[in-house]
């Protein structure tokens, strides 16, 4: 790639329409702590999180010509989904199955901790250069059963967990982390919402 903005590029994304998970926090860390790294973030032009990326710089509009160019030029493709940063996840998933992949190293940041069997993430079905694990038992499980080379799964923790640490906060806290749920499904999730509200209310009462 001739253009300097695509050289030694780290391309980062989540689902392509958001910036609020491990992809965002990893990208923010790169921009704030390692400005010498040429990092860019893929996100839709009309995303509600667009301003967060514009504030950091390096936005690549999803589906644009620059997205395709960045995808094929990048040295590292970093994302919370498999086929990270692909302009079309389904298309590039099938192309990868035929051995046709972008040149960049593929880094799978994940969303959270894997606790169940997920055969579609096994090496026979998926290619990754780095499989980030957020817990030691998870790392050992993936290392021993998913079929990747020993260097691929790495226990390095999840980027968004770093944001939970606030050295200046001394009070005791109880952290509640429900499993992932699409934001649009919350209004109809009456039972889970009621259960979590009860737990939080009980916890607050117990700590007073």
PLM features per residue range, with description:
Residues 1-9:
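Non-catalytic membrane-proximal stalk/linker segments that position and tether the catalytic domains
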Residues 3, 46-49, 149, 195-196, ...:
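Serine/threonine-rich low-complexity intrinsically disordered regions
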Residues 8-164:
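Active-site and donor-binding regions of nucleotide-sugar-utilizing enzymes
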Residues 21-34, 159-208:
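Conserved catalytic-core segment of nucleotide-activated headgroup transferases in glycan assembly
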């Amino acid at each position: 790639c001739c253009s300097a903005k695509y050289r030694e590029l780290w391309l980062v994304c989540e689902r392509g329409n958001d910036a609020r998970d491990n992809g965002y926090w990893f990208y923010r860390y790169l921009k704030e702590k390692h400005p010498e790294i040429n990092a860019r973030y893929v996100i839709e032009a009309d995303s509600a999180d667009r301003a967060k990326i514009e504030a950091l710089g390096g936005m690549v509009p999803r589906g644009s010509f620059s997205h395709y160019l960045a995808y094929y030029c990048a040295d590292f493709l970093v994302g919370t989904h498999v086929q990270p940063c692909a302009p079309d996840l389904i298309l590039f998933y099938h192309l990868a199955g035929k051995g046709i992949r972008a040149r960049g190293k593929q880094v799978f940041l994940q969303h959270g901790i894997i606790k169940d069997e997920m055969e579609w993430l096994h090496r026979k079905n998926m290619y990754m250069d780095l499989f980030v694990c957020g817990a030691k038992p998870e790392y050992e499980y993936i290392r021993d059963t998913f079929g990747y080379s020993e260097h691929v799964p790495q226990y390095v923790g999840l980027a968004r967990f770093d944001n939970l640490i606030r050295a200046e906060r001394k009070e005791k806290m109880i952290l509640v982390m429900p499993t992932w749920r699409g934001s649009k499904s919350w209004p109809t999730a009456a039972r889970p919402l009621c259960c979590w509200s009860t737990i939080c209310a009980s916890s607050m009462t117990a700590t007073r």
